[in-house]
Amino acid sequence: MNYKFFIIAKKIEPFYQEAIEEYFKRLQRFCSISLSICKNSKKLPVKDLEKSYKILITPQGKTISSEKFALKIKDLEMKSITDITFLIGEGIEIFDEIFTISQMKMSKGLIATLLAEQLYRAYKILRNEPYHK
């Protein structure tokens, strides 16, 4: 499975970047994953995104439990969807599904960190592995 995180922001704080990289490192044994930061939604590589299943992360999205998120990942894999793009930010009009991390407003770096953690947790759930060491 290939995942892309696109964050619509001028920048994210270095401590969020470090946390995201830590989860990406943990996820490498399960999937391929990358992060891109775009200053505005008009700079998204729309042509590249056409082939990908796009999940918009916004406070207006639907809530989903960790277990249901894991099942969603499994369901997409079963449907032979190999590319999933998570879009974090405003002004995004192309997506297949909308989720929320929280209905509270928070920084995009924090949202990406929490999403990376939940993706890692999803793989641990799907493999019946303990999450905490």
From Swiss-Prot:
Record's subcellular location: Cytoplasm
Keywords: Cytoplasm, Methyltransferase, rRNA processing, S-adenosyl-L-methionine, Transferase
Main location per the UniProt record: cytoplasm
GO annotations of cellular component type: cytoplasm
Annotated InterPro entries: Alpha/beta_knot_MTases (IPR029028), RlmH-like (IPR003742), tRNA_m1G_MTases_N (IPR029026)
Residues noted as binding S-adenosyl-L-methionine in the record, renumbered to the chain: 57, 89, 101-106
Entry GO MF terms: rRNA (pseudouridine-N3-)-methyltransferase activity
Pfam family, one: SPOUT_MTase
Reaction catalyzed: pseudouridine(1915) in 23S rRNA + S-adenosyl-L-methionine = N(3)-methylpseudouridine(1915) in 23S rRNA + S-adenosyl-L-homocysteine + H(+)
Enzyme class: transferase
Family matches, as Gene3D superfamilies: 3.40.1280.10
Transmembrane spans: none
Enzyme Commission (EC) number: 2.1.1.177
Primary role: Specifically methylates the pseudouridine at position 1915 (m3Psi1915) in 23S rRNA.
Family assignment from sequence similarity: Belongs to the RNA methyltransferase RlmH family.
Assembly description: Homodimer.
Protein's name according to its UniProt entry: Ribosomal RNA large subunit methyltransferase H 1
Organism whose genome encodes this protein: Caldanaerobacter subterraneus subsp. tengcongensis (strain DSM 15242 / JCM 11007 / NBRC 100824 / MB4) (Thermoanaerobacter tengcongensis)
Encoding gene (name): rlmH1
